[in-house]
Amino acid sequence: MLVWLAEYLVKYHTFFNVFSYLTFRAIVGLLTALIIALWMGPHLIAWLQKMQIGQVVRNEGPESHFSKRGTPTMGGIMILFSIAVSTLLWARLDNPYVWCVLLVLIGYGIIGFIDDYRKVVRKDTRGLIARWKYFWQSVLALAVAFSMYAIGKDTPATQLVVPFFKDVMPQLGMLYILLAYFVIVGTSNAVNLTDGLDGLAIMPTVFVAAGFALVAWATGNVNFASYLKIPYLMHAGELVIVCTAIVGAGLGFLWFNTYPAQVFMGDVGSLALGGALGTIAVLLRQEFLLVIMGGVFVVETLSVILQVGSFKLRGQRIFRMAPIHHHYELKGWPEPRVIVRFWIISLMLVLIGLATLKVR
């Protein structure tokens, strides 16, 4: 939005040229989202406490979690608001990639909000019925997938980028839609599963978003895309703004979510952030890179799948409790140790993922 204003004002003073620089807008976009989140946090937390919108803790969970009962939840509202405002201010709003991510972010946020509202306010332990949750997630994911396929059909925008192989970029055709669907919905639910400890989900989200900011910048730059042997996508550059807004909003939220948490993001935050990361990966043609950089989310999800599968097939559990972060809690690890070690692993995976762009 401000880019258009600056383009009009530049004829009055060359200072406004600075708004045309992607790096400048990325930095101020991050700071804008961070400041909004830091400002909004205390007000939202106070309102959630007043409305008695507190976390519901399962009795079968780790005993250390009982003290979390009643902690304000649905704090993801501040994350989504910060990202949306920052993106609308600093990104070019004629860019279809920006609107795809915002559609999923807000749409999945609404799904998560309804789920949280039913569980916390209506005291319905089921929340939003699973089949309806997946139905609306699917509708939004398919809407984005079909739209982007129509725009980028038979171009690099629908190729599959395979790590380590610079010449392996098959054209997916209609399989693009199927892949996009599973990546967006899968990542959304993976982040949701990971969001079980104070700050556990938000910091890996920040790391992955920061990694994708670099990838988006390279993908949208014809020279760097050629150098790294990845598809050049003309709309990709503006995703840098979205990614840095996620980083800023995530860090602002972490200020209040760090152990011991003053607020939890709830499904309104986790479903939306996961969906946004999945959408960004699809738009950048870096689904495999998401699996590497978002390895913490992948492992958390696999632990649940293996646990459920093992119990149904053999009547035995593999882990003491799933997702796997609860397994380590029940082994006696203090919660902060689990959180920080998962953060370290996440940072390492993001760096490894970025390295694969060059090792081709």
Swiss-Prot record:
GO terms for biological process: cell division; cell wall organization; peptidoglycan biosynthetic process; regulation of cell shape. GO terms for molecular function: metal ion binding; phospho-N-acetylmuramoyl-pentapeptide-transferase activity; UDP-N-acetylmuramoyl-L-alanyl-D-glutamyl-meso-2,6-diaminopimelyl-D-alanyl-D-alanine:undecaprenyl-phosphate transferase activity. It is found in: Cell inner membrane. Pathway: Cell wall biogenesis; peptidoglycan biosynthesis. The chain crosses the membrane at residues 27-47, 71-91, 97-117, 132-152, 168-188, 199-219, 236-256, 263-283, 288-308, 338-358. InterPro entries: Glycosyl_transferase_4 (IPR000715), PNAcMuramoyl-5peptid_Trfase (IPR003524), PNAcMuramoyl-5peptid_Trfase_CS (IPR018480). Its cofactor is Mg(2+). Pfam families: Glycos_transf_4, MraY_sig1. This is Phospho-N-acetylmuramoyl-pentapeptide-transferase. It comes from Proteus mirabilis (strain HI4320). The lineage of its organism: Bacteria, Pseudomonadati, Pseudomonadota, Gammaproteobacteria, Enterobacterales.
